[in-house]
Amino acid sequence: MASGAGGIGGGGGGGKIRTRRCHQGPVKPYQQGRPQHQGILSRVTESVKNIVPGWLQRYFNKSENACSCSVNADEVPRWPENREDEREIYVDENTNTDDGRTTPEPTGSNTEEPSTTSTASNYPDVLTRPSLHRSHLNFSVLESPALHCQPSTSSAFPIGSSGFSLVKEIKDSTSQHDDDNISTTSGFSSRASEKDIAVSKNTSLPPLWSPEAERSHSLSQHTAISSKKPAFNLSAFGTLSTSLGNSSILKTSQLGDSPFYPGKTTYGGAAAAVRQNKVRSTPYQAPVRRQMKAKQLNAQSYGVTSSTARRILQSLEKMSSPLADAKRIPSAVSSPLNSPLDRSGIDSTVFQAKKEKVDSQYPPVQRLMTPKPVSIATNRTVYFKPSLTPSGDLRKTNQRIDKKNSTVDEKNISRQNREQESGFSYPNFSIPAANGLSSGVGGGGGKMRRERTTHFVASKPSEEEEVEVPLLPQISLPISSSSLPTFNFSSPAISAASSSSVSPSQPLSNKVQMTSLGSTGNPVFTFSSPIVKSTQADVLPPASIGFTFSVPLAKTELSGPNSSSETVLSSSVTAQDNTVVNSSSSKKRSAPCEDPFTPAKILREGSVLDILKTPGFMSPKVDSPALQPTTTSSIVYTRPAISTFSSSGVEFGESLKAGSSWQCDTCLLQNKVTDNKCIACQAAKLPLKETAKQTGIGTPSKSDKPASTSGTGFGDKFKPAIGTWDCDTCLVQNKPEAVKCVACETPKPGTGVKRALPLTVASESPVTASSSTTVTTGTLGFGDKFKRPVGSWECPVCCVSNKAEDSRCVSCTSEKPGLVSASSSNSVPVSLPSGGCLGLDKFKKPEGSWDCEVCLVQNKADSTKCIACESAKPGTKSEFKGFGTSSSLNPAPSAFKFGIPSSSSGLSQTFTSTGNFKFGDQGGFKLGTSSDSGSTNTMNTNFKFPKPTGDFKFGVLPDSKPEEIKNDSKNDNFQFGPSSGLSNPASSAPFQFGVSTLGQQEKKEELPQSSSAGFSFGAGVANPSSAAIDTTVTSENKSGFNFGTIDTKSVSVTPFTYKTTEAKKEDASATKGGFTFGKVDSAALSSPSMFVLGRTEEKQQEPVTSTSLVFGKKADNEEPKCQPVFSFGNSEQTKDESSSKPTFSFSVAKPSVKESDQLAKATFAFGNQTNTTTDQGAAKPAFSFLNSSSSSSSTPATSSSASIFGSSTSSSSPPVAAFVFGQASNPVSSSAFGNSAESSTSQPLLFPQDGKPATTSSTASAAPPFVFGTGASSNSTVSSGFTFGATTTSSSSGSFFVFGTGHSAPSASPAFGANQTPTFGQSQGASQPNPPSFGSISSSTALFSAGSQPVPPPTFGTVSSSSQPPVFGQQPSQSAFGSGTANASSVFQFGSSTTNFNFTNNNPSGVFTFGASPSTPAAAAQPSGSGGFSFSQSPASFTVGSNGKNMFSSSGTSVSGRKIKTAVRRKK
């Protein structure tokens, strides 16, 4: 069947591209006959691959593969292996491609098709249709081995009906599931995709699709045929063998794959794919996007990665990367056999061809990615496949190129190789199917690859061979020859006078032969090859001082001795012109010479060093010999042998001292002769005589000829000139005329100038160098230079070698051994200066100076303290300030105290507007315990770590000072240690991580409106008595962050204590925000905001809003108006005042709100929290994660939000929203996640189990607890609790959101526990407003039911507002997302605040609270100056439940204001 289908594919005009795609299929050597088996359908299918979704293609491939398997029995057994391998590759791909859409179904689906059964089993993914069809379009069709077999399957199925149905299904799946695939991150995330999969499989998707695809493609192919344009079917070129199918799998990625999606980028699902078929039907339509996708052949399974992530990864992999591009570079070395393995990276098995094809299946980049030997030939690199399957196109193109590039022999070789490897004949592109199996099927390249590989192997080697011997043009070194002197360490024997003065134009022949070395008897070492010496002194113009350019000798005139100049030629440099003449480089420019080296036209005589010494060497004039011939020098100075190092025998140093340059005496820089001043230091040039003297070289004369220098050794060149003297101080060699060392200006020895050290006038060098530079030092060896001078002595102290004339060691000034007197016969006695030898005395310790015993710093004699550490001078009585305890009654000294400051003195410090950041007493920064005796420093802006009234304390803070609270002082303290600062009851909110007992005594008169926020991590007992003993802070916002225990009994102290903090604050109406992680006992009257992680007991006796964030146990006896307590420990809040106190406690929190003030008390307790809000006007939302008994007895309109994570007992009648994760007993509408019994309006959010029944039913305050545990909210006020535990809400309009069993009596609070509010568990709402609950709801309010309640506000929490909020059912007048009584105050508070941002803004105060916060106008007004951004209590709250209204029910309870109605709701 497959064979039957073959023709169409070949015929398709667009088939070319498709054919290339088909080529991608892996090529198997034994599959040569395979293409014959490929049917027209197969070809069509392969052509259609572009159009058909990858997953469908997989079906086809499987079918074809199955068919092919059946067709070729021999291949069938291999099929499993191949398929296995391919499947691994393919499955990985599919897994990536499928984006997790692949389902177990594939196996079953595979079985659906008998032919594809084996294939399916092998390729379960193939059958699986990924929801993202695009991604799979490419992969599946090409990838599935059945792809090639598919034609038969396709033929079996009518193209029309099945194709259409399949198409439709694909459209649905593709459009939907492509989207799904895009949108969803998991495999078959969309039902449609699964459905489609099932449908497609059941429908025999491969057949259907192949026919459908065949229709469009056959048309296109036929069109191509009709147009007689060469069309190529991948199948035509490749066999339908499974290996080909496998390669097709890989090819699929190449099919018009989007860099971002595994499949074709046709957007619009299957419909788009169909359109693509038509569009692609155009034979030569080149897909616009030919992306080089670097996709791994073996796509690793992406475990849990979502389909989207996988798509992204796949797209990235497919992207062309530098590495992939580099890999694309063909490696001619590797053989075609190796290439497939290398390329595909698949197991090196018999199926290398297949693997290769698989490799090719990937986008060209990917194929290229795998380092493929010759097979990836430049063709691949060069050609980009216009077709959707880039690889196939590339391969075809490559084949063409190969054909073009390769000779017939190469073709034959390549064919043989290919045939051996893949068993394919070299296909003609014009012939669609002639080439046979693998080349076409193999991803458009099995065969082609082989071909290319072979091709390249054949062709490239020759090319490489040609390239092997590149003809490199001689490029002169950019470096001037002068900079690259040649060092000849064997001195050639040079005959002097051999250099006849030849016109400079005559080049010196390069034939210069190395004359016998050592003929002159000179040492073997030669610095530069001897330049031909012009022994004629006449040649030397008088102007050339010490430097002569030898006239270049005509090569005819070159004598043997001159031949030595050859050596010189390379190093010869045009010194004057700074032109380096390289004989080799100049040979071309010089007159033709048979010699290998053409001599420079102008030869400069002299050593390289001479030239190096010349300023030209340092100047850019120096040109490389190649760049500038020596002709540049207009004047040729023939310097006698002076410039010839070894041959001339001139000293090495003298050559440097050539007359062409002069050395600056000051900076020793070589300057040009023409320079009158040193170019560096601008020192004037010395007269010629002086120069000669300094250089030790006279103007070169005939006598300068190195006749006598032949015996000098190499070392002689380095010997100092006669008269030079070495500075004893810096050892710099100075010229004879210098009276001072040029470096250190030390007087020359014997000049009569006083020197620190006696210096010898004698020169080190025994050699006397005459100005003629002729060194007479015979044959001194090089090592002689390093021999110790006669008479030199070694200092026994420092082992420094000293000269014989030195009476003292030049280093340590030690006396010369055996010398009694400091002076010697040849040394000048010198009186050392007071500074000691060399001024070393300066380093001596001044007389009387003393070293600090502490820091070892040397101090002056008159210093009584160390200048560094101020330590007292030894023997002097100095006051040492240690880190011990310092008790300073005056806070003026700023001490940083880490200890427990026991400030027991009546420190009535009125830090009225002191913007002090104090960690302890103002006095100082003390590390130890400090007792602060009250000093009143108003406006004292010091950075003090001792305790101020608002303390951040990490230790136990016993604040037992009565403090005079001045309402204008604002004390923010940050204490790390316990600070016994009596913080005013005014706003004392400790942030305590320990147990925090906030027993704010009701000294309201003293703390009118001071809000203290304490953050204590220890148990803090804040009992600020109104007496301003310690710190008088009145109406000051005091935020304390206490990590220890805090006993704050003075002005509102916000301790941050890590230890137990006892903050007793007597100020009422002060906002106390305490965040305590320990036990915090805060009795401050000011509204404390306690965040207690431990047990929190809050007893607020005043309507102060106390916001406590308590992480420890916190006993708040006083609850300011705004007291949010966030307690992570046991939190006991006794709210005596109508202050809303939000408590967030992670421990047991017992907020006892005793005061029926208008306090919104939000308790957020993570531990057991007892919120007893006696204030009736305080709405207390408790958010407790542990047992939370929130009983707010105060029924005023104060919204006490107790957010308790511990047990929160909020009994405040004001709206208290308790968010209880444990059991929350929230009589108030409390949101308790635990059992929250909130009798007050406080809304505790209790996460732990809180079995504390609501103490007292609060009045019309709406406290919606959010209870996740059992929540019993018996609050008459609207209590909207979100409780996950059982919540008994007996609040009037408390709506609980209870996940557990909740009894919500009056308040309709959504409770996740049992709660009157809408609960997800059983909820018994005793209060008339029954919040919709997800559990059983015993509430008069209909939950989710269309009842007729007068006012159902659309509230997510309970809304106690006189207005009827619009509900999802009936909306009377109030439209709020939470139950909110909009008071006049407009505050966007998440805690309690008079002004609330309510969506149901009926009361003046509108609060947007996430806890239940029925905003009672009075309650809203009550919060003391708390216009804060509170997350807890608030009169108006955004509550999940509605005040006695069913949020989700059409029936609305017309609850106006505090009107409590029992919603009739279903009860479970």
UniProtKB/Swiss-Prot annotation:
* UniProt-recorded Gene Ontology molecular function terms: chromatin binding; double-stranded DNA binding; identical protein binding; molecular condensate scaffold activity; nuclear localization sequence binding; protein-membrane adaptor activity; small GTPase binding; structural constituent of nuclear pore
A Gene Ontology CC term for this entry? nuclear membrane
Q: Which residues are glycosylated?
A: 534, 544, 902, 1106
For Zn(2+) 1, which residues are the binding ones?
Answer: 664, 667, 678, 681
**Feature: compositional bias, Basic and acidic residues:** 78-90, 393-421, 960-971
Residues found modified as Phosphoserine? 183, 186, 193, 204, 210, 241, 258, 321, 331, 334-335, 339, 344, 500, 516, 529, 607, 619, 633, 886, 1450, 1454, 1456
Q: Note down the stretches annotated as region 29 X 2 AA repeats of F-G.
A: 237-1411
Q: Where does Zn(2+) 2 bind?
A: 727, 730, 741, 744
Polar residues: which segments have biased composition?
Answer: 104-122, 182-191, 693-711, 972-985, 1314-1348, 1357-1380, 1439-1456
N-acetylalanine PTM sites in chain numbering: 2
Q: Which windows of the sequence hold sequence repeats?
A: 237-238, 652-653, 714-715, 782-783, 898-899, 919-920, 954-955, 976-977, 993-994, 1017-1018, 1077-1078, 1111-1112, 1128-1129, 1166-1167, 1205-1206, 1221-1222, 1233-1234, 1268-1269, 1282-1283, 1284-1285, 1299-1300, 1312-1313, 1320-1321, 1334-1335, 1356-1357, 1368-1369, 1377-1378, 1390-1391, 1410-1411
GO BP term (any one)? RNA export from nucleus
Q: Which sites bind Zn(2+) 4?
A: 852, 855, 866, 869
Record's Pfam families? Answer: Nup153, Nup_retrotrp_bd, Zn_ribbon_RanBP
Subcellular location(s) per record: Nucleus; Nucleus membrane; Nucleus, Nuclear pore complex
Zinc finger region(s), RanBP2-type: 657-687, 721-750, 789-818, 846-875
Q: What is known of its domains?
A: Contains FG repeats. FG repeats are interaction sites for karyopherins (importins, exportins) and form probably an affinity gradient, guiding the transport proteins unidirectionally with their cargo through the NPC. FG repeat regions are highly flexible and lack ordered secondary structure. The overall conservation of FG repeats regarding exact sequence, spacing, and repeat unit length is limited.
Question: How does it associate, per the subunit comment?
Answer: Part of the nuclear pore complex (NPC). Interacts with TPR (via coiled coil region); the interaction is direct and provides a link between the core structure and the TPR-containing nuclear basket of the nuclear pore complex (NPC). Interacts with HIKESHI. Interacts with SENP2. Interacts with XPO5. Interacts with RAN; the interaction occurs in a GTP- and GDP-independent manner. Interacts with MCM3AP; this interaction is required for MCM3AP localization at the nuclear pore complex. Interacts with MAPK1.
What's the protein name? Answer: Nuclear pore complex protein Nup153
Q: Which organism is it from?
A: Rattus norvegicus
The opening ranks of the lineage are:
Eukaryota, Metazoa, Chordata, Craniata, Vertebrata
